[in-house]
Structures are given as C-alpha cells and as structure tokens.
Amino acid sequence: MTSYSYRQSSSTSSFGGMGGGSMRFGAGGAFRAPSIHGGSGGRGVSVSSARFVSSSSGGYGGGYGGALATSDGLLAGNEKLTMQNLNDRLASYLEKVRALEEANGDLEVKIRDWYQKQGPGPARDYSHYFKTIEDLRDQILGATIENSKIVLQIDNARLAADDFRTKFETEQALRMSVEADINGLRRVLDELTLARTDLEMQIEGLKEELAYLKKNHEEEMSVLKGQVGGQVSVEVDSAPGIDLAKILSDMRSQYEVIAEKNRKDAEAWFISQTEELNREVAGHTEQLQISKTEVTDLRRTLQGLEIELQSQLSMKAALEGTLAETEARFGAQLAQIQALISGIEAQLSDVRADTERQNQEYQHLMDIKTRLEQEIATYRNLLEGQDAYFNDLSLAKAL
C-alpha cells in the first residue's frame, strides 16, 4: 500500500492536474489533510478525518508563540469537500496512470509481437536465385563468346571469299585477254590461210602459165623444125644467124629457175609461217586449257565458299535468334526478381515507417507518463509537506 499526505502553505496557491480542475487555499488558514492510502491503480483509497487549523503567524518560517485557535467543527464541510475533491482527483490521476501503464504494456506487447512477425526474423533464402542468375550469366557469356567466334569465322570466310573473288576476277580478266589474243591469232590464221590460198592460186597460175609456155614452146619448136627440114641449104656469105633454139632453151631454163625459186621461196615462207602459227596456236591452246582448268577450279571453290558462307549466315541468324530469345526470357525472369525485390523493399520501407511511427507514439506516451509521474511526485511532496506542517502545528499547540 502507498501512503500519500498533503501539506498546504498559508499563502494562496493553486495547481492543476490532468483533469483540468484546480485547488485553491486561502491565506491565514491551513488544514490538516488526512492520510490517504491508495492501492495500485487508485483502488481501495481511504481518507482519514481532517481538521482545520488557524494561525495568525501567516508563514512557515515564523515562530509558534501566537495564539492558536482550533476547532474540530470549524469549516468541517469545506474540509470534507476539499478532501473529497482531492481524493477524486488523485483517484483520477491514479486511474489514468494505471490506464496509461496498461496501454503502454499493450503497446509494448504489440510492438514485440510485430517485431517478431514483421521484424528482421529469418531472412529469406535467395541463394538459389543467385545460383540461377550466375548460371544464366555464364550461359549468356558463353553464348556471347561463341557468337563472337562465329562472327570472327564469318569475317574470315568473307575475307577469304573476297580474296577468291579477286583472284577469280584476275583470272577472268586474264582469260578474257587470252581469248582476245586467241581471237587475234585466229584472225591472223585466217589472213595466213587467205595468203596461202592466194599463193596456191598464184602457184597454180604459174604452173598453168608454165604449161602454156611449154606447150607454146613445143609448138614453136615443131614449127621451126618443120621449117628447117623443108628448106634448101644455101650457103651465102653473110653474118651468122641467130640460134633461136638456144635462146629459147636459155629462156626456158631461166623461167624454170625463176619459177622453181619462187615456188621454193613461197613454199618455205608458207611452211615457216604455218609452223610459227601452229606453235603460237599450240602455246595459246595449252595456256587457254590451263586457264580454263583454273577457272573451273576457282568456280568450284567459289561455289563451295558461297555454300559455306550461306550455311554460316544461317547459323549466325539461328544463333542470334536463340541469343535474343534467351536474353528476352532471362530478362523477364530478372524483371520478375527485380519486381519481387522492389516489393520486399517497399514492404521493408513501410515496416520501417510504421516502426518509426510507433516509436514516436511510444516516446510520446513515455513523455506523458514522465509528466504524470512528475505531477504525482509533486502531489506527494505537497502532501508530505502539508502533513509535516500540521505536525509542527500540533507540536506547537501541545507546547
């Protein structure tokens, strides 16, 4: 049980509590407050009898030599009302203190329960998410490296194709040049053929002319022989006659030599030109065959490279599609995980804000409790001081 006692000075004083009321005592008089015994929370409060004491000294520090008038019945009604008011206010204070203590206890229990439910608690295990994310990153990195290798291979294949294309264009230009040379040689061959035909025709003409000359010569010889055989030899002294047979023989010999020489020269020139042309044609034909073989090989190589390039491009497109699909799928998963993390962070922020608000409310309630305890201590000091004052007055009266 807790005991409270009031002590009131002779000067006028007033104080208020949470109930909003006030107590006032007039100067020149004092009363002896009874002992107040109250249980926990203001229950079982009992008040003893009170008596009013009048003093002419009017202060605490003055002597007690003045006359003291006492009366148990004086202002008895006022004392009862005052004490009843004090008892009611004290009971109200104690009831409020008890209610605040209960509310404080309830809040502490709620805060403890909330911390147990919403507090840090057992942390959620995201290790399997981390492992999955790490595996996905490794897969993406591997796919990126593989894609880079494929791109490098494609670039190498493109460079090789460009090189082969350049070689092909060079060989094609060489082939066209060789074909142009062959066409030129063909024109030369045609010209040589025409020249050969012309020479053959000239030879035939010369042969015909030679045959005609032979025939004409034979006819003339026959005529001359007939004329010589039928003539009478007459010897006259004259200049020696011209030997026509010898002249004709010499002319025939000269013509035959000239014709044979022309024939041999023409035949030798024709043979030399034909052999040279055949050699050139053979050389160009061999070179043309080699060029055709190289062109065929290059064309076959180019077709193989084009097929390989198409396959590499198809593989690249497939890998790019797979990479895009993988990035989209794992991007969606990462977005879901990020949304989950954002939701958890929002919940954590709400929990922190709620905790801060409850801490502020708790601090506010603690401040109210502290002020109430200070007021109760003030009442206690007032009661104890009033009791000591009345005890001093009682001792002075006894003396």
From Swiss-Prot:
Annotated signal sequence range: none
Xref: PROSITE patterns: IF_ROD_1, IF_ROD_2
UniProt-annotated stretches for the region Rod-like helical tail: 387-399
Region (Linker 12): 225-247
Annotated site residue numbers, Stutter: 266, 326
Start and end residues of each stretch annotated as Coil 1A: 79-114
Positions bearing Phosphothreonine: 322
Coil 1B: region residues: 133-224
Residues in IF rod domain copies: 79-390
Modified residues (Phosphoserine): 14, 22, 35, 40, 57, 71, 394
Any one GO MF annotation of this record: structural molecule activity
GO cellular component annotations of the record: cytoskeleton; intermediate filament
Region span, Necessary for interaction with PNN: 243-389
Keyword terms, alphabetized: Coiled coil, Intermediate filament, Keratin, Methylation, Phosphoprotein
Residue ranges of the region described as Coil 2: 248-386
UniProt-listed SMART domains: Filament
Subunit structure: Heterotetramer of two type I and two type II keratins. Interacts with PNN and the actin-binding domain of DMD.
UniProt comment concerning the protein's domains: This keratin differs from all other IF proteins in lacking the C-terminal tail domain.
Function: Involved in the organization of myofibers. Together with KRT8, helps to link the contractile apparatus to dystrophin at the costameres of striated muscle.
PANTHER family the UniProt entry points to: INTERMEDIATE FILAMENT (PTHR23239), KERATIN, TYPE I CYTOSKELETAL 19 (PTHR23239:SF14)
Note: There are two types of cytoskeletal and microfibrillar keratin: I (acidic; 40-55 kDa) and II (neutral to basic; 56-70 kDa).
Protein name, per record: Keratin, type I cytoskeletal 19
